[in-house]
């Protein structure tokens, strides 16, 4: 697991950072979907976390549960918000808060 964690973190850096990368741990009897970045307690409550990884983890969960249409809609909304470049969090070069980014994604849905 150590090497998998290292490789996944390196790959996250290639796509823009840990704030963008969702994860899925799928086993025989269950599945867990979560951002790969962890809890980031040092910036908790500051409203500057990028929620993309969390939102996309939910999309992965919906796809796993057979809700492909809902999963695709969420992924498209996230992609559209990022592509527009108007409502980006600090880690993506913007000034939007966590809530502002999430609200922009919701508006796209």
Q: Residue spans of the language-model regions?
A:
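Glycine-rich phosphate/nucleotide-binding loop
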Residues: 1-86
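Glycine-rich phosphate/pyrophosphate-binding loop and the adjoining helix
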Residues: 68, 77-109
